[in-house]
Amino acid sequence: MKAILLLSGGMDSLVTTAIAQQAGFELAAMHVNYGQRTMQRELNSFRAICSHYSIQQRLEINADFLGKIGGSSLTDLSMPVSVANLESHAIPASYVPFRNAGFLSMAVSWAEVIGAERIFIGAVEEDSSGYPDCRKIFYEAFNRVIELGTKPETHIEVVTPLIALKKWEIVRKGIELHAPFAFSWSCYKNEGQACGVCDSCALRLRAFEQAGMEDPIDYETRPHYIDC
């Protein structure tokens, strides 16, 4: 069975790739450039991960309209990337409004063309930034949208294997599957050394600490988030 990976190049999409490959799917990978600060580094990670897993069928999409819409510190350079507060329950400024719905729509279009029946996305609801389009209920609803909005003979399902996992469990799963974490990129701010203090870096560093593992990428600073 053919499956599409929505592969950002981050640690969650990397581990999702490892899971899908282990499950025996014929993989095609999609990456979306949307004007984010770390666009080139994420694209490099996407290509490295695809090469590692010998994924030949790839689609790189330019969706810079999300940057033009704005509203996120990932795409609007006038908005600072905030320092992580892992105790906060507020949705951070890094949230890109309704981004995942747009990504999924493009993936469904491609799936119809190439005959893929599954779309894998590394969304995480537990132990995450709290983005509304990373909730299980959102993906359940989107699967209904796919059912209603595609041809009767089309059967495409969005799969979220990490949705209920803690971040440290994702790290452990990646280690178990020999996922190349050194190829992945999570920082919202930098393309050279990861900053270590943005929300995404903090969640990643805490996850590796809780898993008892050393994160292989370079950081400007490595705060300890184990008590956060």
Swiss-Prot record:
Pathway assigned to this chain's UniProt record: Purine metabolism; 7-cyano-7-deazaguanine biosynthesis
Residues annotated for Zn(2+) binding in this entry: 187, 195, 198, 201
Assigned protein family: Belongs to the QueC family.
A molecular function GO annotation: zinc ion binding
Gene Ontology BP term (one): queuosine biosynthetic process
Family annotation (InterPro entries): QueC (IPR018317), Rossmann-like_a/b/a_fold (IPR014729)
Function: Catalyzes the ATP-dependent conversion of 7-carboxy-7-deazaguanine (CDG) to 7-cyano-7-deazaguanine (preQ(0)).
Reactions the enzyme catalyzes: 7-carboxy-7-deazaguanine + NH4(+) + ATP = 7-cyano-7-deazaguanine + ADP + phosphate + H2O + H(+)
The protein, known as: 7-cyano-7-deazaguanine synthase
Note on how the cofactor is bound: Binds 1 zinc ion per subunit.
HAMAP family: QueC
Annotated keywords: ATP-binding, Ligase, Metal-binding, Nucleotide-binding, Queuosine biosynthesis, Zinc
Residues bound to ATP: 7-17
Domain of life: Bacteria
Alphabetical list of SUPFAM superfamilies matching this protein: Adenine nucleotide alpha hydrolases-like
Protein's gene: queC
NCBIfam families noted in UniProt: 7-cyano-7-deazaguanine synthase QueC (TIGR00364)
Broad enzyme group: ligase
Pfam families with a match to the protein in the record: QueC
Cofactor(s) in the UniProt record: Zn(2+)
Source organism (scientific name): Chlorobium chlorochromatii (strain CaD3)
Entry EC number(s): 6.3.4.20
Coiled-coil region: none
Signal sequence annotation: none
